[in-house]
Amino acid sequence: MSGFYHKHFLKLLDFTPAELNSLLQLAAKLKADKKSGKEEAKLTGKNIALIFEKDSTRTRCSFEVAAYDQGARVTYLGPSGSQIGHKESIKDTARVLGRMYDGIQYRGYGQEIVETLAEYAGVPVWNGLTNEFHPTQLLADLLTMQEHLPGKTFNEMTLVYAGDARNNMGNSMLEAAALTGLDLRLVAPKACWPEAALVTECRALAQQNGGDITLTEDVAKGVEGADFIYTDVWVSMGEAKEKWAERIALLRDYQVNSKMMQLTGNPEVKFLHCLPAFHDDQTTLGKKMAEEFGLHGGMEVTDEVFESAASIVFDQAENRMHTIKAVMVATLSKLNN
């Protein structure tokens, strides 16, 4: 793990393929050690600040449990719990927290915010999610894929992302494919494709590493032979209702359902989702979607697929914690470098 100590974790393309692989190996080891009761605390005495301008169940719990497992202490600063960007500049917040904490996690809005924190904090800063990138999620996804196809390398795997690919998940998936050599296929309407410049950059790197990146509107062509089909939510609670109708009309044909799974021609294909998922009407937003748009069987994924044996979404959710732990240990512990 040489070279990680005191580094930031802001986006995947900041690292080499070898460095990404070493993080995944460390995560697998930490997971095995925890399961076997052999985990050693390497962060005893460390203090960690968790800045959440956007709430999250999985990210917060993953960072807190990972920190506690490793002997660290955390301070949670929620959407109303800090003055970042309001009464105090990001630059000043970074310099204050950097004097008190050994590491800082940020989950919120623009990538420039986490970049500024990293520039001025003087301690490792980790991106828990920004509008542009979600690197900790992709670490968990890659570990989950390795676990479910242990006999294959990444450049022997085909990952399909169906739906809205112009978001942080689409961008981080491109970066992951660039570093691992995955065969990545973004199956989405053209209006939902990522920025062309990032696609071009990541495709060139993916091809150098034995993979490829394809963008297509053709569902049948895009999912053929897939090992994994991935999707994410189409709408967020904070968005205007007018956008809901527009987004649903645009993406309805890209819902992950039993037909799409069958179109892969792979009876062992697995389903991935970063969660939360609107697969039924048991949530406030899910109920609204069902009532207003007739999406009673699920939105971006049907309940049938979500609850099927092909679904490995809760393995992904667990692996958020193990991979986040690996990032913290690699960047904060001299014992691991």
Swiss-Prot record:
Binding positions (carbamoyl phosphate): 56-59, 83, 107, 134-137, 274-275, 320
Enzyme class: transferase
GO cellular component labels: cytoplasm
Pathway: Amino-acid biosynthesis; L-arginine biosynthesis; L-arginine from L-ornithine and carbamoyl phosphate: step 1/3
Keyword Amino-acid biosynthesis: yes
Residues that coordinate or bind L-ornithine: 168, 232, 236-237
Known EC number: 2.1.3.3
Localisation per UniProt entry: Cytoplasm
GO biological process, one term: arginine biosynthetic process via ornithine
Reaction equation(s) it catalyzes: carbamoyl phosphate + L-ornithine = L-citrulline + phosphate + H(+)
Family annotation (Pfam families): OTCace (PF00185), OTCace_N (PF02729)
Annotated family: Belongs to the aspartate/ornithine carbamoyltransferase superfamily. OTCase family.
Protein name listed in UniProt: Ornithine carbamoyltransferase
Organism: Escherichia coli O139:H28 (strain E24377A / ETEC)
Taxonomic classification: Bacteria, Pseudomonadati, Pseudomonadota, Gammaproteobacteria, Enterobacterales
